[in-house]
């Protein structure tokens, strides 16, 4: 019996060592050598302090900042662990919304968001990504249209001319990946850091 089990045990041990140890360590080392910043999480530092990642959105709410997409992520309810409460951009619980197109709660939330955005910029069409959540709830980017839409509010709050903010948005538009994948986008954290820098001048 041991003679019959030995090949299976040897194969199990070998494959575990190769695929569970050697391969992951090799890929981690290779990624760290070729793409050190990306392998470390694409972290963004300011004055020696990590303030975020270019890959994970943050919940900007102040009038003087550009806002990202709505986030449907949640966290455990402190009062009842069997329930959850909204926790926008909670990276520990990445998820989209389970609300379908016939959901009254979703329709009410979108309607309220559209009305709030229209009050900020009357007469301009509301970009769809400012009222819809992403699949992960952690999307770090918005469309250029969503960024331009927010320029009047940010300009008023920061007392910065709108044309300067529009130029800032234009300078931070990232094109399609490999020229064909995805859509043009603006990283919200990078844009807000640039706004902070502009406001200091």
Curated annotation (Swiss-Prot):
GO terms for molecular function: ATP binding; P-type potassium transmembrane transporter activity. Keywords: ATP-binding, Cell inner membrane, Cell membrane, Ion transport, Membrane, Nucleotide-binding, Potassium, Potassium transport, Transmembrane, Transmembrane helix, Transport. GO terms for cellular component: plasma membrane. The chain crosses the membrane at residues 7-29. Coiled coil: none annotated. It is a single-pass membrane protein. It is found in: Cell inner membrane. It holds the Pfam family KdpC. It comes from the Bacteria. Part of the high-affinity ATP-driven potassium transport (or Kdp) system, which catalyzes the hydrolysis of ATP coupled with the electrogenic transport of potassium into the cytoplasm. This subunit acts as a catalytic chaperone that increases the ATP-binding affinity of the ATP-hydrolyzing subunit KdpB by the formation of a transient KdpB/KdpC/ATP ternary complex. Belongs to the KdpC family. The system is composed of three essential subunits: KdpA, KdpB and KdpC. This is Potassium-transporting ATPase KdpC subunit. It comes from Methylobacterium radiotolerans (strain ATCC 27329 / DSM 1819 / JCM 2831 / NBRC 15690 / NCIMB 10815 / 0-1). The lineage of its organism: Bacteria, Pseudomonadati, Pseudomonadota, Alphaproteobacteria, Hyphomicrobiales.
């Amino acid at each position: 019996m041991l003679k019959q089990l030995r090949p299976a045990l040897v194969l199990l041990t070998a494959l575990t060592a190769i695929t569970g140890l050697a391969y992951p360590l090799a890929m981690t080392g290779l990624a760290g050598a070729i793409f050190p910043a990306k392998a470390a999480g694409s972290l963004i530092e300011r004055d020696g302090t990590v303030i975020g990642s270019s890959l994970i959105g943050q919940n900007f709410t102040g009038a003087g900042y550009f806002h990202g997409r709505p986030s449907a992520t949640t966290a455990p309810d402190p009062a009842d662990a069997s329930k959850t409460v909204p926790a926008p951009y909670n990276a520990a619980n990445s998820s989209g919304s389970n609300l379908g197109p016939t959901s009254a709660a979703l329709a009410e939330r979108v309607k309220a968001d559209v009305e709030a955005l229209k009050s900020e910029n009357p007469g301009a069409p509301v970009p769809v990504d400012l009222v819809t959540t992403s699949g992960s709830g952690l999307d770090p980017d918005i469309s250029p249209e969503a960024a331009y839409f927010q320029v009047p509010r940010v300009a008023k709050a920061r007392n910065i001319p709108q044309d300067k903010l529009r130029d800032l948005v234009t300078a931070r538009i990232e094109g399609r990946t490999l020229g064909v994948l995805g859509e043009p986008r603006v990283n919200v954290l990078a844009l807000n850091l640039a706004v902070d820098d502009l406001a200091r001048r």
